[in-house]
Amino acid sequence: MIRGIIEASRRRGFAPAASWPGEERRDLISSAHAIKSRGQIPIIAEIKPKALGRPLTEEEVFAYARAYADSNACAISVLTEPSNFLGSLENAAIARKAGLPVLRKDFIFDLRQLSEVQADLVLLIAALGVDLDRFIEAARERGMEPLLEVHTEEEMDAALKTDAEIIGINNRNLNTLEVDLNTFERLAPLAKQAGVFLVAESGVHSREDALRMMRAGADAMLVGSELMGRPEKLRDLNRI
């Protein structure tokens, strides 16, 4: 799957570098701590058109972003990959109007992609085999904090050798698409020892799943499919 997405992206080409206003970056870690201090689970709520099987209109994107903000999400994740996930760069810009930190979620393999749209955070996937240090530095130069995603022990080891402050453990195997919450539970202790901010990704469908990830050491979790079509469910998921 990954190879096909990258090849499609190469054929599509890259968007021109965006002109970014001089806005301060919205900080995920501070936002998550604020949510937790209110007795709630910090959730990065995702706008994932593929879960509905169709692209979203601009009005729908903003409605989701506003609903997530009203339900106390700590941030909004936006899929920007168009071919497989039906996302767009415009969706990230629209979601940012809701006032929360926005994570651009895509398959970033070329430095030029980091200039395509303004976001507060950007997903960097260790499995893509890019120069992590170089991409982390480039993301920060563009005003974005990287969320470095791993799925295996080897990827975690590589991530911990960088100065990434936020590491996401994806419970989904990107090759098989199988999901196993044990992945987070197995890898989390390695990251917690290093003192990084830890995000659990994929597989959270219930409040019980969310609490399980928190007990395993998650500082926040990313939830996508479960909220599409029913963003109000966030109020149930984030209750401690």
Model regions: which residues?
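An N-cap/entry alpha-helix motif that binds or orients negatively charged groups
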Residues: 1-56
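Conserved, mostly hydrophobic/aromatic
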Residues: 5, 45, 68, 76, ...
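N-terminal active-site wall of soluble small-molecule enzyme domains
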Residues: 42, 53-140, 147, 155, ...
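Active-site beta-loop-alpha junctions enriched in small/polar residues
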Residues: 48-52, 81, 107, 127, ...
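Glycine-rich phosphate-binding active-site loops on the catalytic face of alpha/beta enzymes
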Residues: 74, 78-80, 120-133, 169-176, ...
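Catalytic cores of alpha/beta
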Residues: 102, 109-120, 151-163, 194-223, ...
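Catalytic-face loop-and-helix region of soluble metabolic enzyme cores
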Residues: 166-209
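C-terminal helical cap(s) of enzyme catalytic domains, especially alpha/beta-barrels
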Residues: 181-191, 214, 227-240
